[in-house]
């Protein structure tokens, strides 16, 4: 599966449709405590960085599964959105256009 963030690729392709994947991740109380401390002293909150990277990877895998089900061999126009659903949860959504690259 070829993944592209651009909306158009130079190869000939057939558009198969929208594909998406999402992952909702809850924060761990231990991470919240460490995040609070980091908020005071500054610096990267590695636990949250790892959590969001894992969520992005899972969401991407789910999008790829949807594309495979349509018979796609590529996805173009990929975009990621991250949002907070509740006080202790984050959602990562990824979406793009499934395509069958012909050449």
UniProtKB/Swiss-Prot annotation:
InterPro entries: UPF0145_dom_sf, UPF0145_YbjQ-like. This is UPF0145 protein HH_1800. Belongs to the UPF0145 family. SUPFAM superfamilies: YbjQ-like. Transmembrane segments: none annotated. It comes from Helicobacter hepaticus (strain ATCC 51449 / 3B1). PANTHER family: UPF0145 PROTEIN SCO3412 (PTHR34068:SF2), UPF0145 PROTEIN YBJQ (PTHR34068).
């Amino acid at each position: 599966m070829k993944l592209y963030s651009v909306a158009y690729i130079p190869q000939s392709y057939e558009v198969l449709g929208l594909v998406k994947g999402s992952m909702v991740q809850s924060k761990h109380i231990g991470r919240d405590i460490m995040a609070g401390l980091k908020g005071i002293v500054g610096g990267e909150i590695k636990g949250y960085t790892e959590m969001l990277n894992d969520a992005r990877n899972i969401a991407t895998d789910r999008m790829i599964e949807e594309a495979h089900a349509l018979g796609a061999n590529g996805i173009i126009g990929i975009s990621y959105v991250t949002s907070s659903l509740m006080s202790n949860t984050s959602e990562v959504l990824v979406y793009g256009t499934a395509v069958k690259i012909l050449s």
